[in-house]
């Protein structure tokens, strides 16, 4: 165990706090940095420093997010905390801060509230894979039965949205007492228990490079005497010379073989996630491939035209629409590298959607796009972004 201290390269995991306003998300975030710094290294961030989160622009959307870091014995955590409910909604839908797992903070005194529910639902929709619960303000509840009742309510809520409610770790504690250095069960030890739950309950994330190969097509060139070169940034996986790939999206899927990988005009044996590469394709004409398609490992991704999405509509101040839209709205959906027109079907009982709202909708595209659940997209009108969304469920 003593050796672990010297390993600089701890596994990196992204987490964040979610939950109802004033249930103690930011206090807990501060406590995690303080106790992490004392035990495992890192830097303590005080409540005020976290609360004064700067505004950031992510894809033209204004989001306030605080980023902090702390360590456990085995991992390095990057943690996001948002000051306002609207910031959470935007953050989760745009994927500005991707989470490998979330810490749901729920006040033991109040129990689950509307935003508790909404954040769990959003986590399900946008594909946050794991949730660990911190029942905060346990110092304000004397009745053990009441604590049990709140815990049961939280478990039921999690199960309702397809999280494993019965198996989810729920830690009782007081973030405020922990910050003050209190050593009772609900003080510092509760924070250590929470970190241990993060370590054990959130599995190691799969690195992009270990996932099946995928590269969105940005450009297509024809090089005389050599054939067709497709350029783009490799989103995931590794591609080697001689690998068979599929070209997916817009038109019928077809297979080909990669006969060359180039980067910065140099020939390589392979390209991997994060690389901007040019791939030479065997027997492929320039007109066989277009921007908006993807090159991928055969069978790893399918083209779809209809999906359920969770969408945030930009407000007027963010450069979005000034007026609401109604059912049958037909904007462009920008996936990876291209715009595809689609029609929006609103949920029953929703007549119109106002700028600044978030809404669940079913989208039908005029051409198929290679997609998985969790894929992010922008909604545009004539090149101007008016919304951001994520594929929650594929319909067909």
Swiss-Prot record:
Region ranges (G5): 174-176
Subcellular locations according to the entry: Cytoplasm
Domain tr-type G: 10-206
Primary localization: cytoplasm
UniProt cross-references to Gene3D superfamilies, sorted A to Z: P-loop containing nucleotide triphosphate hydrolases, Translation factors
Region annotation (G3) ranges: 81-84
Enzyme Commission number(s) of this protein: 3.6.5.3
Residues binding Mg(2+), per UniProt: 26
SUPFAM superfamilies in the cross-refs: EF-Tu/eEF-1alpha/eIF2-gamma C-terminal domain, P-loop containing nucleoside triphosphate hydrolases, Translation proteins
MF-aspect GO terms: GTP binding; GTPase activity; guanosine tetraphosphate binding; translation elongation factor activity
GO cellular component: cytosol
Region entry G1, spans: 19-26
Residue runs in coiled coils: none
Keywords: Cytoplasm, Elongation factor, GTP-binding, Hydrolase, Magnesium, Metal-binding, Nucleotide-binding, Protein biosynthesis
Positions contributing to GTP binding: 19-26, 81-85, 136-139
The keyword Metal-binding is annotated on this UniProt entry: yes
Region (G4), start-end ranges: 136-139
Family note: Belongs to the TRAFAC class translation factor GTPase superfamily. Classic translation factor GTPase family. EF-Tu/EF-1A subfamily.
Function, in words: GTP hydrolase that promotes the GTP-dependent binding of aminoacyl-tRNA to the A-site of ribosomes during protein biosynthesis.
Quaternary organization: Monomer.
Protein name as catalogued: Elongation factor Tu 1
Source organism (scientific name): Xanthomonas campestris pv. campestris (strain B100)
Gene: tuf1
């Amino acid at each position: 165990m003593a050796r672990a201290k010297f390993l600089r390269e701890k596994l990196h995991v992204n987490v964040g706090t979610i939950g109802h306003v004033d249930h103690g998300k930011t206090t807990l975030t501060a406590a995690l940095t303080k106790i992490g710094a004392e035990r495992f290294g890192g830097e303590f961030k005080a409540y005020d420093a976290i609360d004064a989160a700067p505004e950031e622009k992510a894809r033209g959307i204004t989001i306030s997010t605080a980023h902090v870091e702390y360590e456990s014995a085995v991992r390095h955590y990057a943690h996001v905390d948002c000051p306002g409910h609207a910031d959470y909604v935007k953050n989760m839908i745009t994927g500005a801060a991707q989470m490998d797992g979330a810490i749901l903070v729920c006040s033991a005194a109040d129990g689950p509230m509307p935003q508790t529910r909404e954040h769990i639902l959003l986590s399900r929709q946008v594909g946050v894979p794991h949730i660990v619960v911190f029942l905060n303000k346990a110092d304000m509840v004397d009745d053990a039965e009441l604590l049990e009742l709140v815990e049961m309510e939280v478990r039921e809520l999690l199960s309702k949205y397809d999280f494993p409610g019965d198996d989810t770790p729920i830690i009782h504690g007081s973030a405020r007492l922990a910050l003050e250095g209190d050593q009772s069960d609900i003080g510092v030890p509760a924070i250590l228990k929470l970190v241990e739950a993060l370590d054990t309950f959130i599995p190691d994330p799969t690195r992009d490079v270990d996932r099946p190969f995928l590269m969105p097509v940005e450009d297509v060139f024809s090089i005389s005497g050599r054939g067709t070169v497709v350029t783009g940034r490799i989103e995931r996986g590794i591609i080697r010379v001689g690998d068979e790939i599929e070209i997916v999206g817009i038109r019928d899927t077809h297979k080909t073989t990669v006969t060359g990988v180039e980067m910065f005009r140099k020939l390589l044996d392979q390209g991997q996630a994060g690389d901007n590469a040019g791939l030479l394709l065997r027997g492929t004409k320039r007109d066989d491939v277009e921007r908006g398609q993807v090159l991928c490992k055969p069978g790893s991704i399918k083209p779809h035209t209809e999906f359920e999405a969770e969408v945030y509509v930009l407000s007027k101040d963010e450069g979005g629409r000034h007026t609401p839209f109604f059912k049958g709205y037909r904007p462009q959906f920008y996936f990876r590298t291209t715009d595809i027109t689609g029609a929006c079907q609103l949920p029953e009982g929703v007549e119109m959607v106002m700028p600044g709202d978030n809404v669940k909708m079913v989208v039908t595209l005029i051409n198929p796009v290679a997609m998985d659940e969790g894929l992010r997209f922008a909604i545009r009108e004539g090149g101007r972004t008016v919304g951001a969304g994520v594929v929650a469920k594929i319909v067909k």
